[in-house]
Amino acid sequence: MYDLNISDAKFSILFKGAAMKKYFNIAGPCNPDKHYMILSESRCKGIKELIEQEQYFVIHAARQSGKTTLLLELVKKLNDEGRYHALYCSLESLQGTDNSKEGIPEIIRELRNGIEFSGDYPHVSFAENADFDNFTGVLKVSLTRFCKSLKKPLVILFDEIDCLSNGTLIAFLRQLRSGYVSRSAIPFVHSVGLIGMRNIRDYKGKIREERETLGSASPFNIVTKVMTLRDFTKEEVSVLYAQHTEVTGQVFSHEVIDSVYHQTQGQPWLVNAVVREIVTEILESDYSKSVTPEHVGQAVETIIQRRDTHIDSLLERLKEERIRRVVEPVLTGEEKGFDFTDDDYLYVLDLGLMKNIKGVLKPSNPIYAEVIIRKLSSASQMSMDSSGFPPEAPAYLENGILNMKKLLTDFQQFWRDNSEIWQERFLYKEAAPHLILTAFLQRVINSGGRTDRELATGRKRL
């Protein structure tokens, strides 16, 4: 019994004294005590100034780009500074709740949970005895009473604002607007942030029923500024990876950083996913081993084939008609001449699927370009795999050199025999020739090798 107590005591000491090793995070918000990370506030400057000016604002960025991490950082910083009460509120549970009679009470419950469990409001209650039958005004009344009871101004950052739609969205914004315009006389929220994937201009597209019009007093006009959370720069990728080097001694050369940045273009989830795959899977956490550009290529291929949720959620969007209308001309290399105010065009940009680079619409990074092509041509490739044609790469190699004439001759014959049937299989029918070619080439390199594709917008080439 005595030995057991000593053992327990030792275990307790070891457990409490052990520092968790930091790692590259690819799931959920980042925590500076657990994860290697770049502070998100540096990628979205000017928020503090908007809060000081009592403004309501929007931050939008693609999924897994650091939005929630930014909000949690900001809430902690504001509360630590002591000038404001800052509250984080996720609206994710409101997904699909269109009816404001159900949606507004749910928003109030989310706020109540955040207030209760934060521990920052021990002597103040929120929405006690709230009249939920008055769903067109209960949110405003609850926030007004709460703000009146506080000694400091209240800042609320609403995450996952995209989850609101139709009646719930209108009732939510209208009550914020009503409180906003009268707050010089009646207490209300000092500053509000609405954070999601979309710019607020596109929230109007989520109002489907004609009777739910915005009217002349649009609730959207309370927003002073719309901001986005940019991707990492190459220098920030280097700084992020250097944190791992400082702890482990494992070095990332300039060539490795260049390769990672080229493949990811600084998209935060991809930047973390590539290095995590290299460090933990390819090199098996052996920090004595050097990281090479070849490891980057290997990690990228694994991520493409594995199709994590981050990749899969983007690929599911390709089925949407509004996405197809924008993406298909990019695949076929046509000069589309997009209207930069077109909702579908802006939707694709907001999702992070495409970027406008010097007036040319392109996939946001080579990884996205590759997964888009492979997704759209996957059925064709599987059919080729089962038929055994075309043969894999060795059949086209002569003394280690690719026999282009034989390869193209086989493709021409394949096209003559199959193109009419196969084109009907594609969702993106205009891009079918390009997709069949990519599937053909992917089948050829299955036994080893890679294809590097460039989408030549405006030149009708791949």
Language-model segment annotations:
Residues 80-96:
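Conserved catalytic segments around the Walker B and adjacent sensor/switch elements
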Residues 28-29, 168-263, 277, 281-285, ...:
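The catalytic "switch" region of P-loop NTPases
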Residues 440-462:
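Active-site metal-binding core of divalent-cation-utilizing nuclease and nuclease-like domains
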Residues 369-399:
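Short, amphipathic alpha-helical interaction segments positioned at domain boundaries
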Residues 7-65, 69-78, 141, 145, ...:
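Walker A/P-loop-proximal flanking segment of P-loop NTPase domains
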Residues 165-166, 397-398, 417-435:
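A short, highly charged nucleic-acid-interacting micro-segment common to nuclease
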Residues 110-158, 163-177, 182-191:
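Mid-core helix/loop region of P-loop NTP-binding domains shared across ATPases and GTPases
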Residues 235-238, 242-351, 357-358, 386-390:
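Winged-helix-like regulatory helical subdomains adjacent to P-loop NTPase cores
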